[in-house]
Swiss-Prot record:
HAMAP family listed in its UniProt record: Ribosomal_bL17
Organism of origin: Cytophaga hutchinsonii (strain ATCC 33406 / DSM 1761 / CIP 103989 / NBRC 15051 / NCIMB 9469 / D465)
Gene: rplQ
Name of the featured protein: Large ribosomal subunit protein bL17
Signal peptide location: none
Disulphides: none
Amino acid sequence: MRHGKKDNHLGRTVTHRRALLSNMASSLILHKRISTTVPKAKELRKYVEPLITKAKADSTHSRRTVFSYLQNKDSVKELFDNVVEKIAARPGGYTRILKTGARIGDNADMCIIELVDYNETYVKDSEVKVAAKRTRRSTAAKKDDSSESTGAEPQA
């Protein structure tokens, strides 16, 4: 019986799945954004977010624990030196999954999983939208403006 076993096995053995998630987590930390299938991205999110939370406490024990999951010195160094500084104030939700449609060969649902604070396009768009907001004028003000611009005076 599989009561309470809600992890997606991704059609792999336990060791193959651990290696897959470890490699994908290292790639995500190093490149900040990777393209993959939706089920893999959802499993990767469950795998990498606790590692990022653990990296906030920069201690020897947390470094060794994260290294036991990632097994890549470069990605551990990147995580503790650069990524944690940027997400220090965030209480969780360090990754974002953006669906990109179906893959051409086998129609698999594809997506992009990325670290939230590293996407500059969303940050710039939100700042521009805040600056571009204007108040709306009433229709009466528009009628007054149009009558003044034509030179016609309203009759009393």
